[in-house]
A protein has these predicted regions:
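Charge-rich, well-structured scaffold segments of protease-associated domains
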Residues: 85-218
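Short, positively charged and aromatic/hydrophobic N-terminal segments
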Residues: 2, 7-18
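His/Glu-rich zincin catalytic helix
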Residues: 13-85, 193-218
Length: 218
């Protein structure tokens, strides 16, 4: 995948009335990481990283690699095992999730404001310090292949994919986000290299929706 940059952001705003004149605070750290903060008085806060590397950045033969990287990023870091990642926020009523689209990859959380430091620490850990254990990668291959099989059972999804393939013919934008089962199995050992090339400070943005300003030290 071509080198693109991560960004920390928030896209899920459920308990806040939106106005046309919302005041965002924006910062750029010395390392190039961009931070966006929307103040809120809500007891629930939202934060996440947006990495500007999605399926449009995949090279020929890499279709599905961005989505694969998203899955295995949750499978362990230098500090945490997979089970710790899954339970870190859930144990205090928080939510941790991710998704991949044509333009980028997003890792985000929703949590009570008193636990925001826990969410930021976990998100930063999985984005910057994932270790991609080969055993977990091998298991996740089958999970993704099952997801692809379910996707292929949906005529509506297949029609939409064909429409995009025609509309963006010759461009990565026309590719299916999941790729094929054959591709997923073929490039599983290349996943670590692809992730390290995509998760750089210059293409990353951090966003938050909370009542306290984010320190530049974050």
């Amino acid at each position: 995948m071509q080198n693109k940059c991560p960004i920390f952001w928030i896209n899920y705003i459920f308990n806040v009335t939106l106005h046309l004149e919302m005041k965002y605070n924006t910062y750029t750290l010395d390392n190039g990481l961009r931070i966006i903060h929307l103040p809120s008085d809500s007891k629930v806060v939202y934060c996440g990283y947006q990495i500007n590397a999605g399926t449009r950045n995949e090279e020929p033969g890499e279709e599905g690699l961005a989505h694969f990287c998203e899955h295995v990023t949750f499978k362990g870091t230098e500090r945490r095992k997979a089970w710790h990642i899954l339970n870190c926020l859930e144990s205090v009523g928080g939510d941790l999730n991710a998704y991949t689209n044509k333009e980028g990859t997003v890792y985000y959380s929703a949590i009570l404001k008193e636990h925001i430091a826990r969410a930021v620490d976990l998100l930063s850990d999985i984005v910057f310090h994932s270790v991609y254990p080969q055993a977990e990668i091998d298991k996740e291959v089958e999970v993704i292949c099952d997801e692809i099989e379910s996707y292929n059972d949906s005529p509506a999804e297949l029609i939409y994919d064909e429409f995009e393939n025609i509309l963006f013919k010759g461009s990565p934008l026309g590719h299916n986000i999941l790729g094929t089962a054959e591709q997923v199995r073929a490039f599983k050992r290349r996943m670590r290299c692809a992730s390290q090339g995509s998760f750089t400070d210059q293409i990353m943005r951090y966003s938050s929706l909370m009542g306290i300003l984010i320190s530049k030290n974050w």
